[in-house]
Amino acid sequence: LEEQSLIPIRNPDEMGLDIEEAVKRLNASAEYKMLFQKIFGQRPDAKNLAAAFAAFEETLETVDSKFDDWSNNLGKLTAQEERGRQLFVGDKAKCFDCHRMEDFTTDEFKNIGLYDERKLNDAGLYNITKKENDKGKFKTPGLRNVAVTAPYMHNGMFKTLEEVLNYYNSPDWFIENSVNRDDALKTPLRLTAQE
């Protein structure tokens, strides 16, 4: 979690800062220097910045939604929300195949087609395992609070959920020569604009 927590700082679509610059900014603040000294016994650095972010992320509560109320028989979904739920768990959108459990993820590594060995050249899990069939695989993210966590995908290439769905509707239109795309994603979803 600590390693992951620094990614949004470096990501140009989020904070777009070098970690060193983020640490420099923290050290320029008397308040943050005092807080880091109190908690970590030293001034801010990359290691304790990651630890602070990870500790914060562990406090986030994400299971208090209307869907949670519905699943615990504490509330009802509107007709539109129920249609969305049916799409999510059904055979047309197939979201539930990869996004299930409490956090809407299986925590499995999948290649959703965002790897072509050229422009999209982050090989994902392959960088660790060196197994050819792991090229382009990334851990399936949870979808809790997904509406407020843009940008999307491991590389932040989609700015809106509509762009994400457009990709799943026509993946070959976005990336012609995807390498090792998961079989479950080789057929476009063909969702309508209303869906």
Would you name each region that the model predicts?
Residues L1-E195:
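Periplasmic c-type cytochrome electron-transfer domains
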